[in-house]
């Protein structure tokens, strides 16, 4: 077998071989470091995405729980208002029935008084009729005069003259009592109507205030939910853009590997960039649980 001859004059020097070996070693080391950095960055992105998904699920669950609690509180307040309105209506109904019963009893009492007065008046009139003929027996001249000139008519005229002012007074008193009673009833009805109107206005004002609070709270919840969704979308967009930028920077760093100093500086920059991404906390980790809506107890005043 023929030996292959080696031209010693064409062999490179020891320094050149060492320099080429150092360049190759640096290139291999830089490639390994870049691969490790890319793998670490991808693993960090995967972990961050999982954490974001978990935070979104937790936030959605908490929001649903808050919505259920708010709806339950609104329904409870509505039921309380309905119950109070029914109680107030029942009390007003009982009061009206009681007042109607009082008016009926007063009317019956007035009728009894009028009947007693009429009976008393009839009895007094009968007594006067019985007493008047006895007094005439002692006056023969007057009796003969009355019998000859229509004394019965004159006696009836005198009795009418005596009874007329008394009847007029009784009728006037009865009319005054009736008017006073009517005025009292009208005043009571006016007071009841004014109280009912004031109560209805207060109930309407409270209901309007409750509706305004519920509407304002719903708007705030919608606004906060929209802000969270927008922040989540912006964060996802930034997270999706970072691997692309890193993949574009890889060939450029490989293309500029002239010497050891020029290769080590981009690696340090990329390492600091990766540390910055891993040190940034997730936006949704700072998610604060919304406060519970205040319990509606203002209606119970």
UniProtKB/Swiss-Prot annotation:
Residues 123-175, 214-301 are annotated as: Disordered. One of its GO terms (cellular component) is cytoplasm. Residues 57-131 form a coiled coil. The keyword Transmembrane does not apply. Phosphorylated on tyrosine residues. Residues 123-142, 161-175, 214-262 have a biased composition (Basic and acidic residues). Keywords: Coiled coil, Phosphoprotein. It comes from the Eukaryota. GO terms for molecular function: ubiquitin protein ligase binding. PANTHER family: C3ORF6 PROTEIN-RELATED, COILED-COIL DOMAIN-CONTAINING PROTEIN 50. Involved in EGFR signaling. This is Coiled-coil domain-containing protein 50. The gene is CCDC50.
